[in-house]
């Protein structure tokens, strides 16, 4: 049984439950506000800001996570290998002082950084700037010598001009019931995705079988797990070492069951503990009543290093995308810089 502490998503978003009439009414109001906002930027009534380097925005149309941050980390790593100096812009959701722009280092306190920016800084070692104004964050990154800006989230932040948009879609949940907030999970209508340069479908763990519902413009992303990293020291263990054992599995992400399922597929006996997305952990959260190894996502691990002991392990995700995706992305970037 799960600990039951995960964030609550309305059943009608992804289930067969009818949408309450009041939520349908609120959806109409929300849809009008979204349309007016986009119109204001298209007509120039609201100003947009650009920078002198390419800007890549990675985002999604639904509320909640879809796998943007692992893809952001992989894209940043590929850019570095190709000789770029990427900087990452983020809103820093979940940090306690959203109004203050901040540079994020691997050792920045989590309450000041936010969990996703902290994880990006920890994994990439690159410049990370958090600011509710992504355009201001982009300017700060360029001033520090970055020659490309990667935005973790921000598809709806039209104030920042962008060169490439990448939409990330949960390959299992897709767009839910297809309704806009609050009647459904959509921040914008589904047709908005057609305007993006790339659409990446997070199909979860590797499978030789094709995932249904993929269109010709979709790129399939697969996530792999193969080892666990101790939060104390550099000890690394293959996940095969946990096969046949029971572990406490911790996930404070938008879709905890995906992480639990990936562990089960490795033959691990999962005692699941789902926490709300962006949850700030305390040592008391881990009073589970039994002494078992604790396996968690990297996003959770960055918030537990201060009190973790030798029984705490993070499970890194490895992203796989077709070679042709990377070729298409870098060809697009080369065309941008050669113009």
Swiss-Prot record:
Transmembrane segments: none annotated. Its EC number is 2.7.1.130. The gene is lpxK. GO terms for biological process: lipid A biosynthetic process; lipopolysaccharide core region biosynthetic process. This is Tetraacyldisaccharide 4'-kinase. InterPro entries: LpxK (IPR003758), P-loop_NTPase (IPR027417). Transfers the gamma-phosphate of ATP to the 4'-position of a tetraacyldisaccharide 1-phosphate intermediate (termed DS-1-P) to form tetraacyldisaccharide 1,4'-bis-phosphate (lipid IVA). SUPFAM superfamilies: P-loop containing nucleoside triphosphate hydrolases. ATP binds at residues 62-69. Belongs to the LpxK family. It catalyses: a lipid A disaccharide + ATP = a lipid IVA + ADP + H(+). GO terms for cellular component: plasma membrane. GO terms for molecular function: ATP binding; tetraacyldisaccharide 4'-kinase activity. It comes from Xylella fastidiosa (strain M12). It comes from the Bacteria. Keywords: ATP-binding, Kinase, Lipid A biosynthesis, Lipid biosynthesis, Lipid metabolism, Nucleotide-binding, Transferase. Pathway: Glycolipid biosynthesis; lipid IV(A) biosynthesis; lipid IV(A) from (3R)-3-hydroxytetradecanoyl-[acyl-carrier-protein] and UDP-N-acetyl-alpha-D-glucosamine: step 6/6.
């Amino acid at each position: 049984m799960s600990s039951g502490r995960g964030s609550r998503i309305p059943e009608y978003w992804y289930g067969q439950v009818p949408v309450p009439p009041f939520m349908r009414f609120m959806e109409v109001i929300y849809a009008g506000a979204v349309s007016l906002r986009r119109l204001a930027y298209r007509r120039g009534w609201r100003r947009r800001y650009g920078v002198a380097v390419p800007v890549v925005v990675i985002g999604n149309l639904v509320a909640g996570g879809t796998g943007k941050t692992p893809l952001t980390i992989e894209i940043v790593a590929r850019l570095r290998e190709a000789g770029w100096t990427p900087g990452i812009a983020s809103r820093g959701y979940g940090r306690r002082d959203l109004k203050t722009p901040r540079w994020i280092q691997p050792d920045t306190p989590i309450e000041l950084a936010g969990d996703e920016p902290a994880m990006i800084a920890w994994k990439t070692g690159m410049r990370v700037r958090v600011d509710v104004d992504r355009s201001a964050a982009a300017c700060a990154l360029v001033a520090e010598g970055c020659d490309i800006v990667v935005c973790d989230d921000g598809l709806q932040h039209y104030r920042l001009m962008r060169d490439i948009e990448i939409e990330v879609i949960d390959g299992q949940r897709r767009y839910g019931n297809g309704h806009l907030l609050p009647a459904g999970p959509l921040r914008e209508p589904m047709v908005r995705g057609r305007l993006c340069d790339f659409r990446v479908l997070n199909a979860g763990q590797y499978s030789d079988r094709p995932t249904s519902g993929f269109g010709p413009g979709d790129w399939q992303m697969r996530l792999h797990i193969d080892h666990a990293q101790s939060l104390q020291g550099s000890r690394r263990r293959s996940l095969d070492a946990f096969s046949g054992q029971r572990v406490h599995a911790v996930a404070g992400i938008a879709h905890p069951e995906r992480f639990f399922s990936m562990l089960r597929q490795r033959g691990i006996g999962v005692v699941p503990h789902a926490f709300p997305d962006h949850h700030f952990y305390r040592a008391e959260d881990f009073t589970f009543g039994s002494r078992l190894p604790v396996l968690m996502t990297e996003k959770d691990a960055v918030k537990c290093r201060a009190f973790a002991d030798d029984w705490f392990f993070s499970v890194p995700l490895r992203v796989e995308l077709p070679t042709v995706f990377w070729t298409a992305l870098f060809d697009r970037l080369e065309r941008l810089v050669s113009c």
